[in-house]
Amino acid sequence: MINEIQGFDIKFNEKTSRIINIDISDDIIGKLIFPFNKFDLTALEYKPFTRFTVAKSLDDLSNNKLSKFLNDIIKDRNTGCFIIKPKNITPKINDSFLVKLSTAVAHLIGKPNHDAMAGKYYARFHVKHVDKSDSYLRKAYTNMDLHTDGTYVKEKTDWLLMSKIEEKNVEGGETAMLHLDDWEHCERLYNDPVAKENFVWGSPRSKNIDYKVEHPVFSSDDKGRAQISYIDQFPEPKNMEQGIFLQ
């Protein structure tokens, strides 16, 4: 699934054909400066319509091809993932610009869920050398094991967009992605009867969610293929069978 869109360098990721790399040219970035500068971050946070305005600014520069391409990628089970970024980082690309770019990309796909932890339509945080938070999310030296988003909230989570805005004094720490169809244990776990039982899912205090939800670890899509919703920190097993299954 490789399209040609003027101003965007599109190719398969060097490590897997399941990920599409999209590099935004300097020309496109330059043309985004003016429309992005119409709104500061406070405006984007307070006035939801502005988020779609910056999204349209980006899509217009692709002759409205980018929005369709991004949606085609995430709806295709064979891919489902893209990495989009400026081809070159220039002084004009600061943290505010990158938040606006992420906002634009997200709103070309759909309307993001409200983030209860941040109290906004997006969450932004630092990963530092020392961390005293109550979840693995911000801990620099602790591996986050198998992890999908949306396990402990009532809203349906179809896709996730993550941005790395700045990195200093760091070695390693690359994001690890695993396609469910490439996971060697998926079929065995998916076919385990416990996988379809309702589990209770809670969250630490920092998430600002005052309720718990119930749902299975595994479900099926409209073609009977495995889907998973799981974060190892949040399930609360009801019995020994559920606890052992989670191992």
What residue spans do the PLM features occupy?
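Active-site environment of non-heme Fe oxygenases that use a 2-His-1-carboxylate facial triad
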Residues: 1-61, 76-78, 125-247
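N-terminal, charged low-complexity regulatory/assembly segments
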Residues: 48-54, 72-92, 101
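Short, solvent-exposed beta-alpha or beta-beta edge segments that form flexible loop/patches at the rim
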Residues: 62-69, 75
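Generic hydrophobic alpha-helical segments
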Residues: 69-70, 175
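Glycine-rich, histidine-containing beta strand-loop boundary motifs that form or position
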Residues: 86, 116-120, 164
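Short, charged/polar micro-motifs that form catalytic or ligand-binding hotspots
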Residues: 88-95, 148, 152
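Signature of the catalytic double-stranded beta-helix
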Residues: 94-117, 240-247
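A gly/proline- and charged-residue-enriched helix-loop-helix capping module
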Residues: 103-137
